[in-house]
């Protein structure tokens, strides 16, 4: 099969499972590929590792929830696949330069 098929399968798997505690191994296994080969080809295609892509996808979903819901930071953390709200908040701040609460205050539509 062509690489584009496997990449498409990976993206689909991430979109359907980002809220779970999934790993790069899970994504590669779902595609039927070796983790190292999958990671190398994914990075060639997207310019970032599967883990970086997954984290960015989760952070994007988190911004949507922060802007358009009344869920707590802890609830949003769980909703996007982080078991620890503190770990989520640190990852969010590393990604966007502000905390989830600051993001909500700045961009919330409520």
Whereabouts are the PLM-identified features?
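…primarily DNA-binding HTH/wHTH and HhH modules…
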Residues: 90-110
């Amino acid at each position: 099969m062509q690489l584009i098929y496997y990449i498409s399968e990976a993206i689909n798997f991430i979109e359907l499972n980002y809220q779970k505690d999934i790993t790069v191994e899970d994504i590669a296994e779902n595609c039927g590929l070796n983790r190292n080969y999958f990671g190398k080809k994914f990075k060639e295609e997207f310019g970032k590792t599967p883990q970086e892509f997954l984290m960015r996808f989760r952070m994007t979903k988190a911004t949507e929830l922060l802007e358009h819901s009344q869920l707590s930071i802890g609830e949003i953390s769980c909703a996007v696949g982080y078991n620890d709200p503190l770990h989520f908040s640190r990852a969010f701040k590393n990604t966007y330069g502000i905390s989830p609460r600051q993001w909500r205050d700045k961009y919330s539509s409520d």
